[in-house]
Amino acid sequence: MPRENQKRGRRAAEKAEKDAAKRKREEVPEDSLPKRLKPSTDESTEINQGADYIPFDENYNENYDGNYDENQADAPAGDMPFYGLLDPEEQEYFSRANEVLELNQFQDAEERRIFIDSVYKEANGKELKIACSQGCSRLMEKLISMSDMRQIHRLFNKFIGHFMNLVQHRFASHCCETLFINAAPGVTQKVSKSKSDKMDVDEEEGEEPEPELSLAEMFIKVVEELEGNWGYLLTERFASHTIRVLLLVLAGEPVDVSANDSVVASRKKEKLGLPQGETQDGDVSAQKRSVPDVFEATLKKIMKDIVSVLDDTYLRALATHPVGNPVLQVLVSLELSHFGKSSAKDPNSITRRLIPDESFEEGSETTTFVRGLLYDPVGSRLLETIVRCMPGKAFKGLYKNFIRDQITSLARNITAGYVVLRVLERLGKDDLQNALERIVPQVPSLLERSRMVVPKVLIERCLVRGVDTAPLARALEEAYDKDPARRLEQILRLESTTQEDLEESEQKPKGANAAPSQSSTGEKLHGSLLAQTMLTAPGPISGLIYSSLLAQSSESLVKIAKDPTASRVLQQALTVPTSSAQFRRQFAPRFTSHLKELALDSSGSHVVDALWPATKDIFFIKERMAQELTQHEMALRDSFVGRAVWRNWAMDLYKRRRGEWAMKAKGIDNNNGSGERPKSRIELARAKFAAKAEEDAKKGAQKGVTA
């Protein structure tokens, strides 16, 4: 007889018991108090009221079942209120709405607006449930990002009175953050009625009263709700990022979540809202805004309250706290840049309490604290902010007494090196020259350790300050292979990528994902950025890259062009001002007979686009490339990136009106927008001679009159 299919062993039995307990928890309503449950298969086990409460554990489920207690005032002070669960039908509707917004297949903006209005009507009275729902909170974020100011105003009013709980919630905190960012531009605006409200004002009169408070007053209400809890919220896992946004909104500073150096949110944060290419009011979140005067007074009070409840020891401990450090960065940057660097002289200011001694003498308390931040992965980010924003006098003391003598060893360190970059950005010409002389001997070892960002920033600052880059060019040449072709492979990490691919294909088991390692991807990115920066420097530094590009074969160039990271170097080499006509005359023909392959590739198509401006003064090469593209018209039209290349090269104009295309290819039709042919050298000389003759004639006439 066939044996019953059973899993044996202690682990299988424990897993079966856990699954059974999980099913029972889903079927039976739990207590509405959000306590941390101990893993147990015994249903009779209960947690005592005196047990330690650890909020927002990783395994904590916000959407627990239970009845919503209307009288929240009688609830214990430390409890998180439960706003209820969505019905299965409601969850299904909002999930479908989320999918529709994600696909974004609306015919126009008006159709999307009507759909958003219908979702808001369905969500009326359920806003808090949706914000706290694991499955539907993303829909709330999308709705807020796509809403007009009137809808944001109404939603903000629904959240008033609940912000203390919402900002600490795993999912609702992100909705609060999105709400603050999108409501910020409206603090100085009068909310006008939208089209849908004007159309439905007769049919649905009195459906929902307009909020009495303005958006500015609502922000003040939020601050009043959170008042007295700042010290706790700074290090609260979910509330801290919302507090950062609130502080920046009150200051009128840009709140750009997408920026790489943003302290508002992690780089891994999911980008929700309008599709790419569509923005509301020109991406106002990344711009500075004017705010009411009451905001500045409120911000000062918040910062004063935060500092007053923290002693110096705890304040310095925040500098290395993973959650508290970003908030401290915002506070320091606002104190030094928004309120002026003179505010740092106040003995009770955050900067002064962190760094009481501006002389940075060896052995002092300040020096010990700064040295600890230098080598700490979290604390170094705060030190970067301090270096970027601190007053000039304090920066000079920091550089001369602490960093200058050890800048070489600091640049070699993977953590302290980023602080060195911020220091280099503030140095004057003489100090930068001195720092360059100290760092240049270490360039080969830096490149060997893949610390390519230090030479990159050195090149950029030398160009800005007018410092000679010849010593740096010699150091870069010595660091890489003498063979120009091999040099480019080493800079872009092409050879290491090929070896890794071969090893992975041999060693990886079948079915494993062939994802590149994060370290190799980062090295390739930094190598590409270094090469692009080298191309912007006139002289021997850019010559290292140009000679390497000319030494590559056509097959190698095609491989580089199809690499998403390395292809940027080719685009830069074709369009940067240091690219000479002689180089482009030799380099551009290397891509002929490969244009179809490149035009159909997502990365290579950008290189083909860059060939259009690069061949402006070598028309015969551009015409040869256009003929090659014409031969593969159907293949290009069947591809999304191919159609973009066809359009950017104006190939329809090439086929129908060859003469107009030739004028456009030579840049004639873009001459001051007049459509006139640019004058040749002989014509310019004639015009200059005629102007001089006319000027001499006028002078002769004036002399005759005076005589």
Swiss-Prot record:
KW Ligase (keyword) present: no
Described function: RNA-binding nucleolar protein required for pre-rRNA processing. Involved in production of 18S rRNA and assembly of small ribosomal subunit.
Pfam families: PUF_NOP9 (PF22493)
Any single GO BP term: endonucleolytic cleavage to generate mature 5'-end of SSU-rRNA from (SSU-rRNA, 5.8S rRNA, LSU-rRNA)
Family under the similarity heading: Belongs to the NOP9 family.
Pumilio repeat extents: 122-157, 158-193, 365-400, 401-437, 548-588, 590-627
Region of interest (Disordered), residue spans: 1-77, 268-287, 497-523
Location relative to the cell: Nucleus, Nucleolus
SMART domains hit by this protein: Pumilio
Ranges of biased composition (kind: Low complexity): 57-66
Residue ranges with Basic and acidic residues bias: 1-27
Domain of life, source organism: Eukaryota
GO terms for cellular component: 90S preribosome; nucleolus; preribosome, small subunit precursor
One GO MF term attached to the UniProt entry: RNA binding
Swiss-Prot/TrEMBL keywords: Nucleus, Repeat, Ribosome biogenesis, rRNA processing
Protein name in UniProt: Nucleolar protein 9
